[in-house]
A protein has these predicted regions:
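Cell-wall glycan-active module
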Residues: 1-73, 160, 168-204
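Glycine- and small hydrophobic-enriched segments that form the cores of compact globular domains
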Residues: 48-103, 121
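Alpha-helical segment that forms one wall of the substrate-binding/catalytic cleft
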Residues: 65-77, 83, 109, 114-170
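Solvent-exposed loop/turn segments at secondary-structure junctions
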Residues: 91-96, 116-118, 158-162, 172-173, ...
């Protein structure tokens, strides 16, 4: 899956190349690829490269099937599609690989600001995957999901590119649930002024 992730990162950064590649794929493959390119491209356009690597603390994620069970439990309890929750976790911390707080002070695998966690975290531990996923579902539900996912996601992170990216990855998983396992294996990359740097995965 690492090679696919690398390809999507290249295509997300080059609209012309992406159009050529997508035009040569079959309909089904093109639809999946377009979702990934659109989602990655939105984030690429919004976030600038960094000059220095952030001091990330990283760890292996919980097993994929365990996370999937947590997503399903949250969907059953709050009515928020598991694919949306998985897409949020993918973007926020690469399925829990990043354990550092964000520059804004957001914490845990679903990246909650402490005040938001106090309101929607259900008394759980923001650093525990199950608690964080349930808290995210609770917050998205209170913010308008599932009837208005875009609005709910904008409450979660008020960046249009973020909403576009979450929606793109979630839609791809809705069409093909097995894509969750591909996304689960995506690694942590940092875009720097000198190029991409991979922080997790094979050989590291």
């Amino acid at each position: 899956m690492l090679h696919e992730q690398r390809i999507y990162r290249v295509l997300a950064a080059d609209d012309r190349l992406a159009a050529i590649v997508l035009g040569r794929l079959g309909a089904s493959a093109a639809r999946e690829a377009a979702s990934n390119v659109r989602a990655g491209g939105a984030l690429y356009d919004h976030f600038s490269p960094v000059k220095e690597l952030p001091d990330f603390r990283i760890r292996p994620p919980e097993p994929a099937d365990v996370l999937r069970r947590y997503f399903d439990q949250a969907q059953d309890r709050f009515g928020v599609d598991w694919e949306v929750l998985a897409a949020v976790m993918l973007i926020e911390t690469r399925m829990g690989r990043i354990v550092s707080n964000s520059s804004a002070g957001a914490q845990g695998p679903m990246q909650f600001i402490p005040s938001t966690w106090a309101a929607y975290g259900l008394g759980g531990d923001v650093h525990e995957e199950r608690d964080a996923i349930l808290g995210a579902a609770n917050y998205l539900s209170a913010s308008g999901a599932p009837s208005d996912y875009r609005g709910a996601l904008f409450h979660y992170n008020p960046v249009p590119a973020y909403v576009t990216a979450v929606t793109g990855y979630a839609n791809a998983m809705e069409r093909d649930p097995d894509l969750f396992y591909a996304y689960y294996n995506w690694q942590v990359f940092v875009r720097t002024t000198h190029g991409d740097v991979r922080l997790t995965g094979p050989g590291l």
